[in-house]
């Protein structure tokens, strides 16, 4: 399946303007997707070279980074201002800088769970999964009721192919969910972790809470709801797959395409259609959203196929 425009008889019900930071109300990544990531974009520093050989760049400082840096300089022992700067840097794809900023905060606040969560989150984007796992484990020890810490710990474990542990973390995160949005998000990753662990019956049971009356509040979670209905057999792959993004500035379209393509690709792996899955994963990694979970997951699957 190519990334060229195709007609699939399916449209998004709504669009949402994404905020600047990842954690404000949901697990949205769209706020952190740059409009360009190659040399043609007027990029900042090189962040990483992916395992597939692609150079992934930061974006230059914007007003948010400049202001946050000034605020921290005025009060360098403020955890709140450390987090403000780290999030502003991450929004400009400055992940290495964000990790360094969080580390600076941990030097004077070594028992702050939010700082461990923030650093672990950014390490995931840098593909530093083991350091991320250690930081996120520490966050859960310091704040046992922090849903975001378990959620991101589950991602670290999942990307390390520790699927049983990932399922346990997502199950714990889901138990802490206080909204349908969190229930939907955690259920998706719990399901895929259990399927990758070979626990098909448990995975099916994990979807039992996703009944027709479970509706998303944040409109960007609509594609997760559709994925869950696909897993339940209520929608076909053709119906659930969104069109490719309209262009490099179509951030919401990119996130939706990557997330659903990765989910459907995973489904095809479960059903022994690896060649079809690989086609979807290759489409994802052609895109711009190199920090989205669907992009990272697709990248890892392609790398595993080369082993």
Please annotate each region the language model reported.
Residues 91, 125-126, 159-160, 196, ...:
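Register position in tetratricopeptide repeats
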């Amino acid at each position: 399946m190519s990334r060229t425009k195709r007609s699939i008889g399916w449209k998004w019900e709504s669009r949402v303007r994404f905020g600047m930071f990842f954690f404000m109300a949901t697990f949205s990544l769209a706020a952190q997707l740059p409009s360009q990531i190659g040399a043609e974009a007027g990029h900042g520093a090189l962040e990483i070279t992916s395992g597939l050989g692609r150079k992934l760049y930061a974006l230059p400082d914007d007003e948010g980074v400049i202001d946050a840096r000034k605020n921290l300089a005025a009060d360098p022992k403020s955890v709140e201002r450390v987090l403000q700067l780290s999030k502003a840097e991450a929004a400009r794809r400055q992940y290495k800088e964000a990790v360094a900023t969080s580390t600076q905060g941990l030097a004077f606040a070594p028992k702050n769970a939010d700082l461990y969560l923030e650093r672990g989150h950014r390490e995931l984007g840098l593909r530093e999964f083991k350091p991320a796992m250690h930081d996120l484990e520490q966050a859960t020890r310091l704040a046992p009721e922090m849903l975001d810490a378990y959620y991101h710990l589950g991602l670290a474990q999942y990307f390390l192919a520790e699927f049983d542990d990932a399922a346990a973390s997502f199950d714990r995160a889901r138990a802490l969910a206080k909204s349908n949005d969190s229930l939907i998000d955690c259920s998706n990753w719990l399901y895929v972790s259990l399927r990758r662990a070979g626990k098909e019956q448990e995975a099916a049971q994990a979807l039992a809470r996703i009944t027709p009356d479970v509706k998303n509040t944040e409109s960007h979670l609509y594609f997760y709801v559709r994925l869950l209905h696909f897993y339940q057999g209520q929608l076909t792959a053709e119906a659930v797959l969104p069109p490719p993004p309209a262009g490099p500035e179509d951030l919401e379209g990119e996130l939706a395409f990557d997330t659903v393509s990765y989910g459907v690709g995973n489904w095809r792996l479960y059903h022994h259609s690896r060649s079809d899955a690989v086609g979807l994963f290759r489409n994802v990694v052609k895109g711009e959203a190199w920090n989205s979970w669907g992009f990272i997951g697709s990248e890892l699957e392609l790398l595993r196929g080369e082993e």
